[in-house]
Amino acid sequence: MREIVHLQTGQCGNQIGAAFWQTISGEHGLDGSGVYNGTSDLQLERMNVYFNEASGNKYVPRAVLVDLEPGTMDAVRAGPFGQLFRPDNFVFGQSGAGNNWAKGHYTEGAELVDQVLDVVRREAEGCDCLQGFQITHSLGGGTGAGMGTLLISKIREEFPDRMMATFSVMPSPKVSDTVVEPYNATLSVHQLVENSDATFCIDNEALYDICMRTLKLNNPSYGDLNHLVSAVMSGVTTCLRFPGQLNSDLRKLAVNMVPFPRLHFFMVGFAPLTSRGAHSFRAVTVPELTQQIFDPKNMMAASDFRNGRYLTCSAIYRGKVSMKEVEDQIRNVQNKNTAYFVEWIPNNVQTALCSIPPRGLKMSSTFVGNSTSIQELFKRVGDQFSAMFRRKAFLHWYTGEGMDEMEFTEAESNMNDLVSEYQQYQEASVSDAEEEYDEEAPLEGEE
């Protein structure tokens, strides 16, 4: 089977990762210690995409847990699913990266990275046919951002032909955890543009909004936010974990979603959104799900797709869903919102179906969109970056770890290029391609 090796780095990555494993263990009928007591053979059929079978009916996640300080790891180990993970797969330092990207990427993280790669190698050797890697991390901190991107590039070197998907938590406009977030995020995006095949952008502020607006939670905890993220991660990986009518794997997803290699930053959404503990008992219909996933309020990244256009998108439906109904709904959405889809990629919505719904729901759908409006997110970070970089604020923390200012300048211009590429394709139309931008067009008033 096509296995996936999962890495989680830094505090954010480990907490999201823990929520993800909790969600999919439940879907596959595993208890907190990895013992199978499920009811359906479908749960077992593709168990080994994410789990290794150990002796005695026990399943172990193919997960590598990385952090530069022991705190979060201890929390995961003490959590309800702490006994699930293989003890050797916890790799941690003692010093912490202190929200400093340079520490994670060049000094502290670089010392730990070989240890991590040994564990990754061992997990990869235990696979029949490794499909790729997925990594959960945040881009605003030191470990997840700095060391996470270091791991990605090292894994890229060693497994150049395997897929690399990242679930990256972007710094959000209003909710800021650290002052140097814009630096860390820009340096990370600089790496992700080159080394990742698919990056699912998640943003704390958008998650807060969903919690407050849709789920009616007054003061959402990180637990609630992670619950949302794990629902999306479980949805994106459904097709890999269960037999379905229309299956897709990481590579198929990427082939359908990435029209140009650098533009692989996706917005994600999930429906039906239900608050934790209050699983809705009302029936959900395909039209309702479709309407909900194409609703800007449901996007887990703080950018509004109505300000841009979709290059491609993918909708994954789970549960007892009729193919025809899905096709009709998707066609319906495209016809009503033609302005939001680029016309030079016909049929740019891909659908996948899986007959096993998530726990507690009759059906659900997950949305992955490659929209040019994601540039808002990069623009926002870029503006904050240049405001600080112009004054060289906080730079000594980075140069002190051996970084060069040049690297900041490169990262900044790479991110600006990314924004203008998105802009260029947003404005492109079918006829442009034929005319190939006539360079010598006379300026107004010159004729």
From Swiss-Prot:
Residues 432-447 have a biased composition (Acidic residues). GO terms for molecular function: GTP binding; GTPase activity; metal ion binding; structural constituent of cytoskeleton. It holds the Pfam family Tubulin. GTP binds at residues 11, 69, 138, 142-144, 204, 226. One of its GO terms (biological process) is microtubule-based process. Mg(2+) binds at residue 69. GO terms for cellular component: cytoplasm; microtubule. Its cofactor is Mg(2+). It is found in: Cytoplasm, Cytoskeleton. Residues 424-447 are annotated as: Disordered. It comes from the Eukaryota. Keywords: Cytoplasm, Cytoskeleton, GTP-binding, Magnesium, Metal-binding, Microtubule, Nucleotide-binding. Dimer of alpha and beta chains. A typical microtubule is a hollow water-filled tube with an outer diameter of 25 nm and an inner diameter of 15 nM. Alpha-beta heterodimers associate head-to-tail to form protofilaments running lengthwise along the microtubule wall with the beta-tubulin subunit facing the microtubule plus end conferring a structural polarity. Microtubules usually have 13 protofilaments but different protofilament numbers can be found in some organisms and specialized cells. Tubulin is the major constituent of microtubules, a cylinder consisting of laterally associated linear protofilaments composed of alpha- and beta-tubulin heterodimers. Microtubules grow by the addition of GTP-tubulin dimers to the microtubule end, where a stabilizing cap forms. Below the cap, tubulin dimers are in GDP-bound state, owing to GTPase activity of alpha-tubulin. Belongs to the tubulin family. This is Tubulin beta chain. It comes from Zymoseptoria tritici.
